[in-house]
């Protein structure tokens, strides 16, 4: 009620209520709209700006893009056709990176010509395009090469350091002669007389047991130094062929005892200097000595003469 005795009522306002409803509906509609991710919004804005002319495209952009496109197609074609390396070789060689000097070291048995051929050096090979890993894989396939290190020394030099395998002996298998390592691995066929001083191992499995057997002879150098060939018998035991033709037949087991007996017989009886064809040490309870054919004939002649002399003596008595 105001001062004049009138009642005052609050006006609710239907228009105000309707306005609030409209604002709420607008907010709800805005929430229901799909919002693009941030990266897509950038592309959309760029497209709109490009279409409306707000972004200026520089002159010759189309030409440059076309050239780049065709260049990419050309590179892709070279890659598919395998011509990329050829182009690289030609380009870098013309720029002054052609290989002109190859320094090979560590090659006692491997010729430099073999190295050059496997590297494919023809005077126009590019140092930049030279594939070190591929070159190494080729060189380690050479029979004497155990390992190899290859370095590029710019602008025109390649350094090749070889580590070669060491020949331990000669292995005869059938009619073939091969050089072997200490491990028994075959290096290459024997083609040179310069390896004639190496020990000769004969027979199946002789190459794998060679180093271990020779090591057991270390305590008897007077015997080992006279061995011409080590012959493997049935993959179980060894025969020693000495420089004077005597064959020493060793047992499958108790090798040190047999070698000790042989050394004693030679020291006391000079058995290895006599007309002996073979010394059989395979049995532990006896040693058999086989005479040479000439010695056997002489012995038989002596026996016959002694027999006749005894018979004659009996008649006289």
From Swiss-Prot:
GO terms for cellular component: cell division site; plasma membrane. Keywords: Cell cycle, Cell division, Cell inner membrane, Cell membrane, Membrane, Transmembrane, Transmembrane helix. The chain crosses the membrane at residues 64-82. InterPro entries: Cell_div_FtsQ/DivIB_C, FtsQ, FtsQ_C_sf, POTRA, POTRA_FtsQ_type. Residues 97-165 form the POTRA domain. Disulfide bonds: none annotated. The keyword Protease does not apply. It is a single-pass type II membrane protein. It is found in: Cell inner membrane. Residues 1-63 are cytoplasmic. Its main location: membrane. Residues 83-317 are periplasmic. PROSITE patterns: POTRA (PS51779). One of its GO terms (biological process) is cell septum assembly. PANTHER family: CELL DIVISION PROTEIN FTSQ. Essential cell division protein. Belongs to the FtsQ/DivIB family. FtsQ subfamily. This is Cell division protein FtsQ. It comes from Agrobacterium fabrum (strain C58 / ATCC 33970).
């Amino acid at each position: 009620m105001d001062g004049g005795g009138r009642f005052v009522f609050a006006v609710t306002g239907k228009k105000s209520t309707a306005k609030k409803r409209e604002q709420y509906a607008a907010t709800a509609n805005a929430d229901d709209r799909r919002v693009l991710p941030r990266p897509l919004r950038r592309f959309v804005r760029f497209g709109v700006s490009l279409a409306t002319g707000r972004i200026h495209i520089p002159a010759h952009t189309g030409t440059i893009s076309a050239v780049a496109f065709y260049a990419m197609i050309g590179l892709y074609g070279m890659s598919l056709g395998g011509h990329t390396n050829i182009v690289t070789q030609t380009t870098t060689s013309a720029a002054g990176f052609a290989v002109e000097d190859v320094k090979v070291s560590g090659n006692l048995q491997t010729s430099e010509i073999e190295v050059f051929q496997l590297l494919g050096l023809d005077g126009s090979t590019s140092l930049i395009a030279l594939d070190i890993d591929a070159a190494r894989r080729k060189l380690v396939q050479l029979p004497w090469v155990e390992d190899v290190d290859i370095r590029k020394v710019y602008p025109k030099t390649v350094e090749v350091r070889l580590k070669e395998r060491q020949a331990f002996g000669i292995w005869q298998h059938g009619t073939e002669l091969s050089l072997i390592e200490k491990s028994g691995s075959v290096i290459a066929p024997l083609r040179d007389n310069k390896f004639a001083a190496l020990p000769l191992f004969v027979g199946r499995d002789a190459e794998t047991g060679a180093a271990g057997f020779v090591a057991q002879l270390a305590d008897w150098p007077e015997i080992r130094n006279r061995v011409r060939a080590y012959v493997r018998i049935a993959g179980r035991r060894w025969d020693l062929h000495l420089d004077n033709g005597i064959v020493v037949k060793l047992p499958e087991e108790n090798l040190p005892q047999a070698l000790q007996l042989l050394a004693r017989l030679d020291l006391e009886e000079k058995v290895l200097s006599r007309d002996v064809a073979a010394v059989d040490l395979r049995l532990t309870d006896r040693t058999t000595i086989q005479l040479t054919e000439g010695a056997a004939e002489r012995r038989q002649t002596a026996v016959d003469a002694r027999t006749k002399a005894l018979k004659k003596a009996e008649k006289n008595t």
